[in-house]
Amino acid sequence: MSNPNEMTDEEIAAAMEAFDLPQPEPPSTPQAATATDGTLAPSAPAEPSHSASPTLDALDESRRPKAKTVCERCPNSVWFASPAELKCYCRVMFLVTWSSKEPNQLTHCDGEFLGQEEG
């Protein structure tokens, strides 16, 4: 009897084929602003709504840091949440850099560049 947590060869093949599928087109939204001549005015580019953390992306906006912190986009940050608290652990400095009980607004840090190869 096989382990229900293991994928079959067919499931793996189907998952690999999904990588070759084209990305879906984002839904088009009408521009709200119009220029004085009646044509549509270009809109300002939207700020990305997601961070480098799936944990932060999954949380309601009310649970995320109010003041932006560099840790939100850092690949060395490990965000974790409980029903009562949200914390960020830094794998470079080996400490909790942010928590909902003790928010610390780090705005700049060299840690986000460690491990990146120069091109």
UniProtKB/Swiss-Prot annotation:
Residues 41-54 have a biased composition (Low complexity). Keywords: Conjugation, Plasmid. This is Protein TraH. Residues 1-67 are annotated as: Disordered. The initiation process of transfer DNA synthesis requires the interaction of at least three plasmid-specific components (TraH, TraI, and TraJ) at the transfer origin resulting in the assembly of a specialized nucleoprotein complex - the relaxosome. It comes from the Bacteria. It comes from Escherichia coli.
